[in-house]
Amino acid sequence: RGLVGSEMCIRDSAMTLQQLKYLVTVAECKNITEAAEKLFISQPSLSAAIHNLENEMGVTAFVRSNKGVSVTREGEELLSFARNLLEQADIMKDRFCNDKSRMPKFSVSCQHYSFAVNAFVDVVNKYDANIYSFILRETQTGEIIDDVANGRSELGILYLFEHNEDVLTKLFKKNDLVFEEIFKASPHVFISKNHPLANNDIITLEELKPYPYLVYEQGKRNSFYFSEEFLSVLDMPKNIQVRDRATLFNLAIGLNGFTVSSGVIDKELNGEDIISKKLDMDCTMRIGLIKKKNIILSRYAISYIDSIKKHTAIV
């Protein structure tokens, strides 16, 4: 059963934000007893609240067993709505309640871009408080989409270009997400400052073929459409997959490897050893953000977007 339509008519529902918080906590803990302890309520009270919510919504959110609980498919859909409602409630309280004791919260999932990290640093510094809970996830493309769709992240940062745009745009639409372009970039190569091609102003694909092509692993969705690099591994004879930016740059230095990206690189963050060179390739990257459709962004998200625009203004 889907949650859209008559089965999710909640006009006369007594559903509360507290119930939604219970639902999300149980899903995170995967155990009713542990969730009850975390929420400081009794296990029977928590079980009753979850059952009441399931009955109201007409869904079975969890499958119970001696080992704990697991989320059903319709439960995942309900959780996505719950996380978004809780996030919007937090944003509303943050905007209208003059409560300085409220903990600042913000989460963003992104591809491996230095400007995304720099913008995150700006937000933390701007809203520095005695306590806060900020999350930055440099992760795989598919997980970025999942994180934003399921309410784990308020924003996602990724890119589109001619070969992945149709596939990813369909995914955005399916998950009720919208893409907003931040800037356009021409393709560049990241290489070591001591690379044999380091003195070239422009580098061709043919010149790169003797060297290892370094790409970010995409897990189960390891198709060209989810790649962070717009140059297919099929075009290069030597390929190495990595999970993090530090490893990629170490291999670029140690093996004279290369990767392709936007050309935006930060020497303070990545050091002086990695340089950017223009790639002789007719292609344009559209780097932007994804967010849930029709949501109000938190002040932290708005500041983050403004900061990204500042860090990429020279592109």
Where are these regions (language model features)?
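Short, small-residue-biased leader/transition segments that mark boundaries at the very start
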Residues: G2-I10
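Short helix-boundary/capping micro-motifs
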Residues: V24-S42
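Central regulatory/effector-binding core of bacterial HTH transcription factors
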Residues: M103-V167
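Secondary-structure junction motif
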Residues: F115-D122, E165, A198-D201, L205, ...
